[in-house]
């Protein structure tokens, strides 16, 4: 018998379980050995925008459980991906892992020291603890995206790319302005693997400008 709340509606956990069981990307992730269905989101983003070229140095922020890291190493190659998360994560073959909280003051320096030379791609699938209040959740994820962008502005090599998750809403004007100032091309994209009912979308910024061009010199 279906589990229901006092109001006769299915519990959130039951709805989540049914959604997982009926989700083709969940089944595909298990079949293909990916740690999460989110792997297909990055694969679809890269199929469209080609940011993960072989040999490019990549930082994957908020990497756990590792689905995006798996796709990144498949496409950029072994030895070119640094996975970063505030929580521990099972290692992904061919990558390095750094436990680091991006909210800490020394985070950018710590990540910069861990890099091997240039940085060509910054990925962020970071998401806040969802409250269910759309405006609050939107503000929180914009803050995470801004933190990821701040790291990119400090460490990204000219010509590099930035991919980050945002929630649809009206508070990301300053973020988009910064992206358009720092990158020659900025696009929004909702990959097919992103659930239709989800407010998430992704910003894909490409061809990072060098410092002089950013300042308008």
Predicted features and spans:
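S-adenosyl-L-methionine
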Residues: 84-131
